[in-house]
Amino acid sequence: MIVTDDNAVLYIDERKLTDEVKEYLQSQGISLAPYTGIWQALKEYEKDTLMIHKNKCNAAVALSIGKKVVYRGNSPIALMKAVKNEVEIKGFERAMLSEGVAMVKLLRWLKPAVEKGGVTELDVDAKLTELRSVDAAFKGLSFATIAAYAANAAIVHYEPTPAENALLAPKGFLLLDCGGQYLSGTTDVTRT
């Protein structure tokens, strides 16, 4: 995307956008152009200076800039997004409340189920998804759940499989890194 004082152009494969999204972008003053057009647009960019996101610029973009003076910094958009309005705050609160209810129900189920025996990491994942699904606002996972027991909790981005799926016992630690997509927001929770 190239944003200037006068306009904003999103370079994208328009087949990826619905008509509704296209109309919305245009109503916000954002023009659409073919994804591959950004290279030429950067070469033809008339101003002498340009700011690029220091962590998001790839080599092709850097090579297309030419001899312009480039400022590498953090996106001012990210800074603006960090300031939340009341609607966003309420949405986060609703999403976290929904997630909290599911987590409390999971913990209430977990202790007696583990003491009874036969609960695996995959069972914990499935039970949490089941408990979230009771909420009509739940639309799916925000990322794959990590339910890691004992030594598995030390494995970065561990994901149990039917072949490698620890049986829980009433001792030790269970790491739960999970998140849900709700109509009002997205959650990311890590607990032991």
Predicted regions, residues:
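Active-site neighborhoods and metal-handling regions in enzymes and metal-associated proteins
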Residues: 1-192
